[in-house]
Amino acid sequence: MKRHLNILGRLQGAGALPFADEFLPLAERATYEALEALSPTRCAGCERAGALICQDCLTSLVLIDPRHSCTRCGAPFGDLLCTECSVEGTSSAMAEALDRCLTCAVYAHPLPRIIKAYKDAGERRLAPYLAELLYDTALHAQVAAPDRYGSVLSGADAVVFVPATAAAFRRRGFDHMEAIARSFCDLSGVSLLDALVKYGHGDQRELGRDERREHARGMNETVEDVRGCRLLLIDDVITTGATMAAAAAELKRAGAAAVDGLAVARVW
């Protein structure tokens, strides 16, 4: 599939670095090569030495076909709506807050390990890789499914990311989605708008569906003028959709004309 080739061609060409090492100044390249000799870069997905994400892991990504995904929640295998969104009253938070939702891949090997390495193990070099996956997905969706995702990227006035809580920022030392968003905007040429601030301190990963929705409600505040803007809201993982729905609802409350969601992975 051509979409696989696009991802492989751009990402694998970078090797173990986020960008091709031939563009590094000679001194930096020598330092990098010395460090690689002492402690080789290992794949975030399988620990194989040589590249930050190896070719086997890239080709193992379970990419979601935008022609057959749920436009409400980004789940795979929903030609119109997925089995959850097609039931009255289900996933209503995402359906009401987001105009459309698009996801890159199913949250299955190797993505959980890659995302964990980036968020919790401090492998910040993965940000451009994940941004590239988001960018490729949006471009592909516009062409492959124009009736569903036309202008999802080209029609966006700005990109907004789901921010980390203050507690998560302190724990990790950086906002993981801000770094991805900056790389994504460099690729796409769309402006970045740091529009949201998130309150709250809890980790949602161990919460159930209803608990996540309650936890996410009221956590966000818009701190930039988004009135009349068409926004592309990005995040890493959609599980129940509560986090993205709450962020999108806040942007709509602040006057955004439209909010589309884009995420790296979809739990399904």
Describe each PLM feature range.
Residues 1-268:
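Glycine-rich phosphate/pyrophosphate-handling loop used in enzymes and phosphotransfer proteins
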